[in-house]
């Protein structure tokens, strides 16, 4: 399941485009949360990679980058995207949402789809997630952070989906 998302698929690795600087935009409307403040050690301690999180105001998740969908989890609570420059992002909607087994989540993409910034990825029932999950805070991490030459966070507090630029990245050449 994690083979393509974490760069273990040799075919996908060899097809990576030449490195370029790219922007990661907010995938949700909400309040920016520092990754270290996410109430889950897997994300707060950057075990999955570095990034940011958003406390969402609504249940509409859009693509934070242009790229290819490399993973849509069966429970629809997480999506993996690979950018043309080779960065691999994981958007994990809420915390402990895997236990909801897809209830309240509607995916608008599938593996192999090409997306642009702002394209709909997943809609979810925010009230149901508040009720059934540990938290609505949604981490967005670059899972191949060790392959980046540039990772610069921009200052922001409130985010607008598909519009607020949050991170500049560039994969090493």
Curated annotation (Swiss-Prot):
Main location: cytoplasm
UniProt site (Important for phospho-donor activity): 77
The protein's name: PTS system glucose-specific EIIA component
GO BP terms in the entry: phosphoenolpyruvate-dependent sugar phosphotransferase system
Localization of this protein: Cytoplasm
Subunit: Heterodimer with glycerol kinase (glpk).
Cofactor: how bound: Binds 1 zinc ion per glycerol kinase EIIA-Glc dimer. The zinc ion is important for dimerization.
Matches recorded under InterPro entries: Dup_hybrid_motif, PTS_EIIA_1_perm, PTS_EIIA_component
Modification Phosphohistidine, positions: 92
Encoding gene per record: crr
GO cellular component, one term: cytoplasm
Keyword set, alphabetical order: Cytoplasm, Kinase, Metal-binding, Phosphoprotein, Phosphotransferase system, Sugar transport, Transferase, Transport, Zinc
Role noted for this protein: The phosphoenolpyruvate-dependent sugar phosphotransferase system (sugar PTS), a major carbohydrate active transport system, catalyzes the phosphorylation of incoming sugar substrates concomitantly with their translocation across the cell membrane. The enzyme II complex composed of PtsG and Crr is involved in glucose transport.
Gene Ontology molecular functions: kinase activity; metal ion binding
Domain notes: The EIIA domain is phosphorylated by phospho-HPr on a histidyl residue. Then, it transfers the phosphoryl group to the EIIB domain.
Swiss-Prot/TrEMBL cofactor(s): Zn(2+)
Positions of the PTS EIIA type-1 domain: 40-144
Annotated residues for binding of Zn(2+): 77, 92
Active site (record annotation): 92 (tele-phosphohistidine intermediate)
Annotated NCBIfam families: PTBA
Organism expressing this protein natively: Halalkalibacterium halodurans (strain ATCC BAA-125 / DSM 18197 / FERM 7344 / JCM 9153 / C-125) (Bacillus halodurans)
